[in-house]
Amino acid sequence: GSICLEPKVVGPCTAYLRRFYFDSETGKCTPFIYGGCEGNGNNFETLRACRAICRA
């Protein structure tokens, strides 16, 4: 889906949440640290969810 093409957004908050995003350049779901607010749809709690939605 199109959310998989959105850029990784850490956001301005300071929570330290391990999430995954689909990297459209590599075609893989990649871990990143999410701040907890103002993210976008390319933000998954599990690698499995990222792969399922973005077909990585």
Curated annotation (Swiss-Prot):
Domain of life, per lineage: Eukaryota
All copies of domain BPTI/Kunitz inhibitor, residue ranges: 4-54
Transmembrane domains' residue ranges: none
This protein's GO CC annotations: extracellular space; nematocyst
UniProt main location, coarse: secreted
Keyword Secreted: yes
Assigned keywords, A-Z: Disulfide bond, Ion channel impairing toxin, Nematocyst, Protease inhibitor, Secreted, Serine protease inhibitor, Toxin
Gene3D superfamilies recorded: Pancreatic trypsin inhibitor Kunitz domain
Keyword Thylakoid assigned: no
Disulphide bridges: C4-C54, C13-C37, C29-C50
Subcellular location(s) of the protein: Secreted; Nematocyst
Database matches in CDD domains: Kunitz_SHPI
Site (Reactive bond for trypsin): residue numbering on this chain: T14, A15
GO terms assigned for molecular function: ion channel regulator activity; serine-type endopeptidase inhibitor activity; toxin activity
Function of the protein: This recombinant serine protease inhibitor inhibits trypsin (Ki=210 nM). In contrast to other sea anemone serine protease inhibitors, it does not significantly blocks histamine influence on intracellular calcium concentration in murine bone marrow-derived macrophages (tested at 1 and 10 uM). In vitro, it shows cytoprotective activity in the oxidative stress agent 6-hydroxydopamine (6-OHDA)-induced neurotoxicity model. In this model, it decreases reactive oxygen species (ROS) levels, and increases cell viability in a correlated manner.
PANTHER family (UniProt xref): BPTI_KUNITZ INHIBITOR DOMAIN-CONTAINING PROTEIN, KUNITZ-TYPE PROTEASE INHIBITOR-RELATED
Miscellaneous comment as given in the Swiss-Prot or TrEMBL entry: Negative results: has no activity on Kv1.1/KCNA1, Kv1.2/KCNA2, Kv1.3/KCNA3, Kv1.4/KCNA4, Kv1.5/KCNA5, Kv1.6/KCNA6, Shaker, Kv11.1/KCNH2/ERG1 potassium channels and on TRPV1, the capsaicin receptors.
Record-stated family: Belongs to the venom Kunitz-type family. Sea anemone type 2 potassium channel toxin subfamily.
Name of protein: PI-stichotoxin-Hcr2m
Lineage: Eukaryota, Metazoa, Cnidaria, Anthozoa, Hexacorallia
